[in-house]
Curated annotation (Swiss-Prot):
It is found in: Secreted. It holds the Pfam family Insulin. PROSITE patterns: INSULIN. Residues 1-19 form the signal peptide. One of its GO terms (molecular function) is growth factor activity. Silk worm has two kinds of PTTH: 4K-PTTH and 22K-PTTH; there are many forms of 4K-PTTH. GO terms for cellular component: extracellular space. Residues 50-71 form a propeptide. This is Bombyxin A-5. Disulfide bonds join C29-C79, C41-C92, C78-C83. Heterodimer of a B chain and an A chain linked by two disulfide bonds. Belongs to the insulin family. The keyword Secreted applies.
Length: 92
């Protein structure tokens, strides 16, 4: 019985994995990165906010915490390495 359950679980896993589409990754740099991000954010209905909109929201107490953090950005994620559309959308 356990063997039958193990085989059924294995077959289900293989069938599920074969239906999953791998995400296509591309490298986006410079103008191509900016244009692609703008198009994706616009299609998703997200307006990119400027830093000025957040200037008054507790920036005095946030500054000490942000200085020591790793400052990876979209260029690190999508220009230096290939990235997926999901990664680009996370920057909208």
């Amino acid at each position: 019985m356990k063997l039958l359950l193990a085989i059924a679980l294995m077959l289900t896993t293989v069938m599920w994995a074969s239906t999953q589409q791998p995400q296509t990754v591309h490298t986006y740099c410079g103008h191509h990165l900016a244009r692609t991000l703008a198009d994706l954010c616009w299609e998703a209905g997200v307006d990119k906010r400027s830093d000025a909109q957040f200037a008054s929201y507790g920036s005095a107490w946030l500054m000490p915490y942000s200085e020591g953090r790793d400052q990876r950005g979209i260029v690190d994620e999508c220009c230096l390495r290939p990235c997926s559309v999901d990664v680009l959308l996370s920057y909208c």
